[in-house]
Amino acid sequence: MALFSAYALAFSLLMIPLILYILRIGRRESGLPPGPSTLPLVGNLHQLPHGGLHLQFTAWAKEFGGIFSLKFGPGTVIVATSPRAVRELIDQKSASTSDRPPSHFSNVITGGNNIGFARYSDYWRRGRRVMHSMLTKKACVNHLTIQRAEASQLMYDYLVEPKEFVAHGQRYANSVITSILAGTRSPHHTSPLVTAFFQMQHEWTHLLTPGAHPPVDMVPFLKYIPGSWKQICAKMKVSQEELYGGMIDACAKRVERGIRNGCFLEGELENKDVDRGLLRGMCSALMEGGSDSTSIYLQSFILMLVAHPEVQAKARAEIDSVVGLDRLPDIEDMDNLPYVSAVIKEVLRLRPITALGAPHYSTQPEVVDGYVIPKNSMIFMNQWGMLHDPDSYDQPESFMPERFLTSPFGTKPGADDTGRSKDIYFGGGRRICVGMHFGQNSLAITSMYLIWAFNLTNAIDPQTKNPIPVDINEYDISLNTIPKPFKCDFQVRSEEHKRMVENAFAEARQVFAPFEQD
């Protein structure tokens, strides 16, 4: 009996440190930014909503300040909502905050070959350097011909099949990037490259949305528990290889046949420093960044114009005064279209493409605003909270393009703009969107064309003959900020505008020809 008691005592003494260690898991360490109270083991995981994470982060920012912390099990999450904190953490300390968090899902699906989700490594730096050479502000001038031509087809598609306006925007965004990247375009919204990409992207976005799947990177043992996400990953691995690998193979076969059109992959296939894995990683990053963001913006842009006819009329009057009625607008006109520029910026402010952006990850401990940012912390830029802050914006939930006519940031007089960036919609630091200039050109061209060619109105209910209302607050917001389905009418402004849209599309066929040779 005495021997048993001795063993029990020894066992208890050995277990005490283990129990104390387990109880410390999930607790907020000293020196971290403040945040909501935690529970042992889980930290703040139990407080995460199934949807609307950006709203919860914004509510916590109001309570705990412009930088706060969360505990996801043993892991630390830092959320920066104030521009000052974002600038210091993401821009000024970019040498140690440019990594991406470990992503089991991404690794299983891509084998590590995705520049957008790649760790801060030589692989990422090589891919970023090659993509940057294709997408500098100067290099993007060379892509304008394709962007204009594809935008001409977009207007024609709106003209002849307006009810499919969402699909037309997806076709445009997809075809522009595949033409420049892989030398092949999509002439119709049902073209295989379009349908395959957006179906795959829908599943990919859902899988990566925080809260939509088990946090296997924060709680590793969860990856061994059966779940539907494993079947989704296996399916997506095949789909991504078929899509991106197929694009690379198709380009290589054209080159072998002596057919070239100057696309990006043609040069890189002959670059001995670029292997297939890096090519695939660049294809996925450019496709996912270029196709999704532009098509989502177009949906929000159309919704805002339908809901605010007075804004549409004012923007149209400005375009008419600068462009006239005998030609389509062009990118050079943007310097003389301050109100149109303000409309574009206000769409991006009110409904940023991503509410939280892709998370960063710290590789070294840092100190920001007197708080410790530990090594291996996941870092979110709360773009939604930043762009909807009532201390910075008058009526932040209202669509008011005029705010950008009096401030480059759209902020109200007296607002603290320290650290604020005009390019926050594209991310920050060394991970800022490599296609930013290309994307800005696409948004400008398509926005000008739409306002110039069409009057966007509410659809008419065939039963009541009354306008069908739209609601600018009806959005599905997960990883991306996407309007829920809505109806509208595209009314071409005149027979002359119709003729010019048709002529522009006819002339664009010469531009399309080299990209329709598969």
UniProtKB/Swiss-Prot annotation:
GO terms for cellular component: membrane. Belongs to the cytochrome P450 family. Glycans are attached at residue 455. This is Cytochrome P450 monooxygenase ARMGADRAFT_1018417. The chain crosses the membrane at residues 3-23. Armillaria species are both devastating forest pathogens and some of the largest and oldest terrestrial organisms on Earth. They forage for hosts and achieve immense colony sizes via rhizomorphs, root-like multicellular structures of clonal dispersal. One genetic Armillaria gallica individual localized in Michigan's Upper Peninsula stands out as exceptionally large, covering hundreds of tree root systems over approximately 75 hectares of the forest floor. Based on observed growth rates of the fungus, the minimum age of this large individual can be estimated as 2500 years. GO terms for molecular function: heme binding; iron ion binding; monooxygenase activity; oxidoreductase activity, acting on paired donors, with incorporation or reduction of molecular oxygen. Its EC number is 1.-.-.-. Its main location: membrane. It comes from Armillaria gallica. Heme binds at residue 433. It is found in: Membrane. The lineage of its organism: Eukaryota, Fungi, Dikarya, Basidiomycota, Agaricomycotina. Pathway: Secondary metabolite biosynthesis.
